[in-house]
Amino acid sequence: MNEKPVLGIQDIQNLLPHRYPFLLVDKILSYDLNTRSVVAQKNVTINEPFFAGHFPGAPIMPGVLILEALAQAAGVLLGIILENDRDKKIALFLGIQKAKFRQPVKPGDVLTLKAEFSLISAKGGKAFAQAFVGSQVVAEGELSFVLVKKESI
């Protein structure tokens, strides 16, 4: 599944502070401000730095990085929503509840990252997020974010 993005890597870098090797979203396939949802994609390649040690001979993407990719996808949507305050505020990943890892993610997989916010306020937000490889859910959880002034970090 190599769909045309609505936001490419340059747009994502304008919305997120992350950079290689920690930028874990390659493109945004869709977003909807009414449903407060986003669909993103991460192409998982054997060249990812974490595969050198996780695990030699049987590489799998660390689950915590799948959750981080989900948080970054949700963070892109928060960046779009923050439009007028983007230069002043930043969303920080605050926590995860009910995280589940269902399948391993391997080199060559395409991760589809989906998040839908149940709450967005001036202080932060909460989203349910799922990562897929094809139609299989590989990870999911409830993500929490806090909005802080950029100058405070």
Curated annotation (Swiss-Prot):
Any one Gene Ontology cellular component term annotated for this protein: cytoplasm
Catalytic residues (positions): H54
Cited SUPFAM superfamilies: Thioesterase/thiol ester dehydrase-isomerase (SSF54637)
EC number: 4.2.1.59
Location of this chain's protein in the cell: Cytoplasm
A GO molecular-function annotation: (3R)-hydroxyacyl-[acyl-carrier-protein] dehydratase activity
Signal sequence, renumbered to the chain: none
NCBIfam families, per database record: fabZ, PRK00006.1
Record keyword Lipid biosynthesis present: yes
Stated name of the protein: 3-hydroxyacyl-[acyl-carrier-protein] dehydratase FabZ
Gene3D superfamilies: Hotdog Thioesterase
Family: Belongs to the thioester dehydratase family. FabZ subfamily.
Pfam families xrefs: FabA
Keywords: Cytoplasm, Lipid A biosynthesis, Lipid biosynthesis, Lipid metabolism, Lyase
GO biological process, one term: lipid A biosynthetic process
